Every structure is written in C-alpha cells, then in structure tokens.
C-alpha cells in the first residue's frame, strides 16, 4: 500500500514543479 502513496506523491511533485515552471517562465522572459 505504501508504494501507491509514494507513486502518487511523485506524480504530485512532478505536476506541481511543471505548473510552477510554466507559471514562472513568462515572468522571467518579460
């Protein structure tokens, strides 16, 4: 069961970091 939480946690971290990069990218370029 723990591996399921680990997998979901990694997916959440990946999606969050992607969202932050997409959100920051236009601000850094302008």
UniProtKB/Swiss-Prot annotation:
Transmembrane segments: 4-24
Keywords, sorted A to Z: Cell inner membrane, Cell membrane, Membrane, Stress response, Transmembrane, Transmembrane helix
Consequence of gene loss (knockout): Not essential, no change in sensitivity to reductant (beta-mercaptoethanol).
S-S bonds: none
GO cellular component terms, semicolon-separated: cell outer membrane; plasma membrane
Membrane topology term: Single-pass membrane protein
Subcellular localization: Cell inner membrane
Protein induction: Expressed during stationary phase and in minimal glycerol medium, at 45 degrees Celsius, strongly (30-fold) induced in low oxygen (at protein level).
Family, per entry: Belongs to the cytochrome ubiquinol oxidase subunit X family.
Function noted in UniProt: Might be part of cytochrome bd-II oxidase (appB and appC). Able to restore reductant resistance to a cydX deletion mutant upon overexpression. CydX and this protein may have some functional overlap.
Subunit structure: Able to interact with CydA and CydB upon overexpression.
Protein name from the UniProt record: Putative cytochrome bd-II ubiquinol oxidase subunit AppX
Gene: appX
